Amino acid sequence: TTSSQSVMKDMATALKTPSVWVVAIVIFTIYATYSASSYMQPYCETVLGMSAVAAGYVGILRKDAIRLLGAPISGFISEKMGGRCALLIGIFDILFIISLAILLVLPVGAQYTVVTVVILVATSFAIYGMRGMYYAIIDEIGTPKKIYGAVAGFAMFIGFLPDAFNSTLCGYWLDAYPGAQGYRNIFIYMLVLIIVNVILIGILLRYISKNKEQIRKNQQELKGEVAE
């Protein structure tokens, strides 16, 4: 049908647009890191030697309190920055990279437990902050309204692919490398993902800077359609 042909044409246009792929992989790296971060709570219990109750409190702090605060706070900061979500994601990337790099070189021991928990909270704030904004960059790059739906659908498809393999991959590391090393491999995996992410964010920021006028026109056109 004509409608199906139009959808396929829009999808083809989206797939031929380099910035769309960059956005999709940005979402992929953030979501994969978020998914892998679920192993931080068992790390506290298995490696740091926390009691199940104490590790549970860390999990509640990380997954509930930080989750509730991360997105609204990042949204507020982004608004104060003029809606520059990509730039703020880049800042969160740096926070995450520094925090996780410290965690990887920090010795395992009871005397470092408090520092480790602070680091886990910092990385959680960064990842939830990024998650709260990654769809906003679809608009920030000036996605034309004609292919907006196709771009959003493609970005979500690529972005959530980690659900297909993350648990298997992390589970393999924990089985093959019992104890601290298994979790260390997961943390290195997360670190690599966010390093890739910050590189891609740099590419997007350059793209946004070079195409300001066209992006502004596309955004105005999209807002006009929403207003109607």
Label each residue range with its predicted role.
Residues T1-V23, E221-E228:
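Juxtamembrane intracellular "pre-TM" segments in multi-pass secondary transporters
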Residues L103-L104, Y183-L222, V226-E228:
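Multi-pass alpha-helical transporter architecture, strongest
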Residues C85, L169-I194:
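A membrane-interface helix-boundary motif in multi-pass transporters
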Residues G142-P178:
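A late C-terminal transmembrane helix in Major Facilitator Superfamily
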Residues G70-G83, L174-D175:
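Helix-to-loop junctions at the C-terminal end of transmembrane segments
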Residues R84-I137:
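C-terminal transmembrane helical hairpin of 12-TM major facilitator-type secondary transporters
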Residues A24, G56-Y57, G90, G149, ...:
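Conserved glycine-rich helix-kink/hinge and helix-boundary motifs of the Major Facilitator Superfamily
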Residues T17-G75, R131, A136, N166-S167:
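Extracytoplasmic gate region of multi-pass secondary transporters
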